[in-house]
C-alpha cells in the first residue's frame, strides 16, 4: 500500500497526469485534517504546497472505535483495521451508521463476491478505489442517503409518477 500512496499524483486537475486535485475548500481541508488528530498515521504521500487546498494521501492505523473508522471522511485518507476472518471484516465494515462506498482488495474472486454481498454499501469496488461511472447507479445506504444518482435508475429518484385520468364522455 505504501508504494501506491507514495506514487499517487496530487496536482492540477487540468493536468492529465494528475490523479487527485485539491480539496474543495479550506474548511473541508480542516475537517479532513481533524480526522488525523490523535490518529496513528502510518504514512503519507505528497501534495503540492502553495495556493490550493492540498492534502496528501494518508494511511492511518485504526481500531473499530476510532472516529476515522466510524465516520465519512470525504478526503484521501485510508483507515486500516486488523480483522480475524471474512465474517469479522464484514462486521467491522458494517459497524457504522454510514454506507456510501467502500473497497475490497483481494486476489480471490469468490471471496470478493461473498464479502461484497455482506457489506452494506451503496457503491463497492473490488481491487479499485474509484468505481463511479456516469452510466452506473451511485448512492449510499443507511445514513449515507437513499436513492441513486447516475445510471438508468437516476430519473426515478428525481421524479414522482402521477396518473391523470380524463373522462371523455
Where is each model-derived feature located?
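Conserved C-terminal structural/oligomerization subdomain of aldehyde/semialdehyde dehydrogenase
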Residues: 6-10, 47, 54-169
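Short linear capping/connector segments at secondary-structure termini
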Residues: 15-20
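Short beta-strand to alpha-helix junction loop
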Residues: 22-33
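Helical element adjacent to the flavin cofactor pocket in flavoenzyme catalytic cores
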Residues: 34-39
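Short secondary-structure junctions
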Residues: 40-47
Amino acid at each position: 500500500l505504501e508504494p501506491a500512496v507514495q506514487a499517487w499524483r496530487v496536482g492540477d486537475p487540468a493536468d492529465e497526469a494528475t490523479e487527485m486535485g485539491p480539496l474543495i475548500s479550506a474548511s473541508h481541508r480542516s475537517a479532513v485534517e481533524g480526522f488525523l488528530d490523535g490518529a496513528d498515521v502510518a504514512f503519507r504521500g505528497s501534495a503540492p504546497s502553495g495556493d490550493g487546498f492540498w492534502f496528501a494521501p494518508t494511511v492511518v492505523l485504526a481500531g473499530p472505535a476510532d472516529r476515522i473508522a466510524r465516520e465519512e471522511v470525504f478526503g484521501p485518507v485510508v483507515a486500516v483495521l486488523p480483522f480475524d476472518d471474512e465474517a469479522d471484516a464484514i462486521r467491522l465494515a458494517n459497524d457504522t451508521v454510514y454506507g456510501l462506498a467502500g473497497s475490497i482488495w483481494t486476489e480471490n474472486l469468490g471471496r470478493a463476491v461473498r464479502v461484497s454481498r455482506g457489506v452494506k454499501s451503496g457503491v463497492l469496488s473490488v481491487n479499485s478505489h474509484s468505481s463511479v461511472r456516469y452510466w452506473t447507479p451511485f448512492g449510499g445506504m443507511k445514513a449515507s442517503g437513499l436513492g441513486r444518482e447516475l445510471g438508468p435508475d437516476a430519473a426515478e429518484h428525481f421524479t414522482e409518477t402521477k396518473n391523470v385520468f380524463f373522462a371523455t364522455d
